[in-house]
A protein has these predicted regions:
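Conserved non-catalytic scaffold segment of RNase H-like nuclease domains
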Residues: 1-111, 125-145
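A short, structured active-site edge motif that brings together acidic residues
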Residues: 111-121
Length: 146
């Protein structure tokens, strides 16, 4: 069982990493199964937050404008990650945006990724929904601010 990893979630301006931009990165460094440190930043990539995204995430243009520029946020996040694997729910979405943002900065973002959605599909095939809030309820885990 992997006990050291980075749990990550990103918010974006849309669904396409080549066209849309990161708005927020939230992560926790898990070592020996315990949260050791967290990382959170809003990102100002110079793109207004679409109204629909504000409705979905609560992220406003004011929050974006208070954020770091990608040239600061991405290297900072990569340093936070070190060489640890990434864990997330539907992590290919997060990974695609993080990798594209790294490439845009002339950096690389290659590492193992663990997807809790794929794991849930395999282990809980009869569960009607595998959305993160539903999995938290199933396992009686407090989702916090996820």
């Amino acid at each position: 069982m992997i006990r050291d990893y980075i749990a990550v979630d990103v918010e974006t301006t849309g669904l396409n990493p080549a066209r849309d931009r990161l708005l927020e990165i939230g992560a926790a460094r898990i070592l020996n199964g315990k949260v050791e440190e967290t990382y959170q930043t809003f990102i100002d990539a110079g793109v207004e937050v679409p109204e629909r995204i504000t409705e979905l995430t609560g992220i406003t243009d004011e929050m974006r404008l208070s954020g770091k520029r990608p040239e600061q946020a991405i290297p900072e996040f990569l340093e936070f990650c070190g060489e640890l694997p990434i864990l997330g729910h539907n992590v290919s979405f997060d990974f695609g945006f993080l990798k594209q943002a790294a490439v845009n900065q002339g950096l690389t973002f290659e590492r193992e990724a663990l997807d809790t959605l794929k794991i849930a599909r395999k282990l809980l095939p009869d569960l009607p929904s595998r959305r993160l809030p539903d999995l938290c309820a199933y396992y009686q885990v407090d989702p916090g601010n996820s």
